[in-house]
């Protein structure tokens, strides 16, 4: 069955575990070394923790989920750019809660190349930060439906560009 817009809704804090697991699995080649200090279980736990905390860039506040039989089968994080100073502060605070002070410093050091890869003019940009679909639900248009949903949100926000970072091994 194809993913319809009726099956996509805003993410909730109660979706944190499902979404964290989906994102950690989708980004597994990068997740363990970058987010879990080499440990995939720790990376998943940290993704879940970051997703659960309100207000940051990795928060459920900035995500939508695809639902099938009352289960989260896909997640997409998306938001307009530029990011407010308040949102950046909340992101940093969330990271400190999940990683601690030293761990947050290490995380942002590891992510420095991603930040520098973004376009400098973000005045009318929109950004897709994460997209993950459960393995058993792939091939049915769920990822495409989530991307279309985010694209429509970008249009409503008046964005002129939409940015997406992908990993070389995304499938």
Please annotate each region the language model reported.
Residues 7-21, 30-33, 81:
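A short beta-loop-alpha structural element at the N-terminal edge
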Residues 28-51, 96-102:
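Conserved GNAT-fold acetyl-CoA-binding loop/helix
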Residues 40-63, 67-68, 115-117:
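Active-site rim helix/loop that mediates acceptor-substrate recognition in acyltransferases
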Residues 65, 71-80, 127, 132:
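Conserved beta-strand in the GNAT
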Residues 82-125:
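Conserved acyl-donor/pantetheine-binding loop and adjacent beta-alpha core of acyl/acetyltransferases
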Residues 124-126, 154-167:
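Conserved GNAT acetyl-CoA-binding A-motif
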Residues 129-138, 164-171:
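Conserved beta-strand-loop-alpha-helix junction that forms the acyl-donor binding cleft
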Residues 135, 139-152, 156:
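Conserved acetyl-CoA-binding loop-helix of GNAT-fold acetyltransferases
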């Amino acid at each position: 069955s194809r993913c319809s817009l009726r099956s996509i809704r805003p993410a909730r804090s109660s979706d944190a575990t499902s979404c964290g697991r989906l994102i950690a699995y989708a980004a597994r080649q990068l997740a363990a070394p970058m987010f879990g200090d080499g440990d995939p279980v720790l990376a998943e736990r940290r993704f879940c923790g970051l997703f659960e905390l309100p207000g940051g860039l990795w928060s459920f506040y900035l995500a939508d989920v695809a639902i099938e039989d009352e289960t989260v089968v896909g997640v997409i994080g998306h938001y307009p750019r530029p990011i407010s100073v308040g949102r950046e502060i909340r992101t940093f605070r969330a990271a400190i809660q999940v990683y601690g002070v030293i761990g947050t410093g290490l995380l942002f050091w590891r992510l420095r190349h991603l930040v520098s890869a973004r376009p400098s003019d973000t005045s009318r940009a929109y950004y897709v930060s994460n997209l993950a679909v459960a393995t058993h639900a792939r091939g049915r248009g769920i990822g495409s439906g989530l991307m279309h949903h985010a694209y429509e949100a970008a249009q409503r926000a008046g964005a002129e560009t939409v940015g997406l970072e992908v990993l070389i091994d995304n499938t």
